[in-house]
Amino acid sequence: MPKLYEGHLIGQGLRFGIVIGRFNEFITNKLLSGALDALNRHGVADQDIEVAWVPGAFEIPMVARKMASAMKYDAVICLGAVIRGATPHFDYVAGEVAKGVARIGLESGVPTIFGVITADSIEQAIERAGAKAGNKGWDAAVTAIEMANLMKILK
């Protein structure tokens, strides 16, 4: 039988950094609420959570890299909302943010979680921020807890 590794969902004693984009704040506030609720319900103390607001999604990777390189967080959670408009701006921003967040996790070894909603409409973003389709902030926080614990096991 192979040896299996899996991160558990107990957040007590873990530290988290959250980077959140202010653009589309009516959506990102809901993501932050979901993430904080998930962290607290899984045993993470408020004093073990630090939140950094950035102007928009494009700035998330820069601050996430700073947090990951500080090596004081067990995981960094990236939250934002990019909503498609009439120009190709959406494609550039969404793609670069996703690549940046992934690169930071790979280079730093600190789980860096992509909790950025990419939506075709405001309605779709609202659904993913706590209405019909769950809350992607909550999902990102639970993923961060699991990955932080898995990385501790694999050290």
From Swiss-Prot:
The Gene Ontology CC terms held by the record are: cytosol; riboflavin synthase complex
Residue numbers binding (2S)-2-hydroxy-3-oxobutyl phosphate? A86, T87, R128
Q: Which InterPro entries match?
A: LS, LS/RS, LS/RS_sf
Instruction: Report the top EC class in one word.
Output: transferase
Quick one: which pathway? Cofactor biosynthesis; riboflavin biosynthesis; riboflavin from 2-hydroxy-3-oxobutyl phosphate and 5-amino-6-(D-ribitylamino)uracil: step 1/2
Q: Where is the active site?
A: H89
Q: Which reaction does it catalyse?
A: (2S)-2-hydroxy-3-oxobutyl phosphate + 5-amino-6-(D-ribitylamino)uracil = 6,7-dimethyl-8-(1-D-ribityl)lumazine + phosphate + 2 H2O + H(+)
Keyword vocabulary terms for this entry: Riboflavin biosynthesis, Transferase
* Gene3D superfamilies assigned: Lumazine/riboflavin synthase
* Keyword Transferase attributed: yes
In which domain of life is the source organism classified? Bacteria
Q: A Gene Ontology molecular-function term?
A: 6,7-dimethyl-8-ribityllumazine synthase activity
E.C. numbers: 2.5.1.78
- Which BP terms from GO are recorded? riboflavin biosynthetic process
Per UniProt, 5-amino-6-(D-ribitylamino)uracil binds at F23, A57, F58, E59, A81, V82, I83, F114
Q: Which PANTHER family match?
A: 6,7-DIMETHYL-8-RIBITYLLUMAZINE SYNTHASE, 6,7-DIMETHYL-8-RIBITYLLUMAZINE SYNTHASE DMRL SYNTHASE LUMAZINE SYNTHASE
**Function, as annotated:** Catalyzes the formation of 6,7-dimethyl-8-ribityllumazine by condensation of 5-amino-6-(D-ribitylamino)uracil with 3,4-dihydroxy-2-butanone 4-phosphate. This is the penultimate step in the biosynthesis of riboflavin.
Protein family per UniProt: Belongs to the DMRL synthase family.
The protein depicted here goes by the name 6,7-dimethyl-8-ribityllumazine synthase
Organism of origin = Pelotomaculum thermopropionicum (strain DSM 13744 / JCM 10971 / SI)
Q: Which gene is transcribed and translated to give this protein? A: ribH
